[in-house]
Amino acid sequence: MLRAGRIQKLTVSRISDYGLYLADEEQNEVLLPNRYISLTDKPGDEKEVFLYHDSEDRLVATTETPLLRVGEAGYLRVVDKTAHGAFLDWGLYGKDLFLPNRNQQGGIIAGRSYIVYLYEDSVTGRCVATTKLKRFINNDLISVKPRQEVALLVASESEIGFRVIVENRHWGMLYRNQLFRPIAVGD
């Protein structure tokens, strides 16, 4: 099944003037534009690609690696702000990530970076960002064990330390008196 916001391994099904058409195991096709193909690509080859919706709402593939995938939190810079929301640089050429007004907590300013979570909109299937993290980051069902090595994202700073997102799922705290190197929001 082809779904936006994820890296998938697909098979080249055919070549067109616009690029390669890649198919999943159910023969659903998506276009990989010419800018991302090589002269050696041929039908039957496997390609690892990231899927997203373009400005015309078509599902498109890219070989670029985004800064975030569905289900991940990150620290992204606002490149533009409109009446409907903000647009974030998520590392894809010519495609910014939408942060709708309804998903913004506090004021968003162009040029600044914010902690966001990337999810798939249940109605449109598009990748959407939110700064309202409570729905996605919680400690209801802890999935990590004591002393387990984990990935952290520093989300905010307080008097006692830094609030962190653990494994894109949980809240944690790094206390100032236990830090062995300087850290900042977004690390």
PLM region descriptions:
Residues M1-D187:
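Single-stranded RNA-binding regions, centering on S1/OB-family and related RNA-binding modules
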